[in-house]
């Protein structure tokens, strides 16, 4: 009987703790942070010239030669660009 009470109490504490963690996660929306604080930019977002690691994931590389846009923006990488970024060892995911 004591075991059942302790188990039930533990489950209640675990449920309350997990709800508070989820609330904290919702408060911090990564899209609201500037690029420098996020660590990387999503596709079609501004990036740092010459730094493919400034684009998130293995799919994104920084492109500064877009014919219709001034500046540098993340684009979807081709096969060779993906391999080059993989070997570069970028820390962001």
Curated annotation (Swiss-Prot):
The keyword Secreted applies. The keyword Transferase does not apply. Contains 5 disulfide bonds. One of its GO terms (cellular component) is extracellular region. It comes from the Eukaryota. Residues 1-18 form the signal peptide. Residues 19-38 form a propeptide. GO terms for molecular function: toxin activity. Expressed by the venom gland. Keywords: Disulfide bond, Secreted, Signal, Toxin. It is found in: Secreted. Belongs to the neurotoxin 31 family. This is U12-lycotoxin-Ls1d.
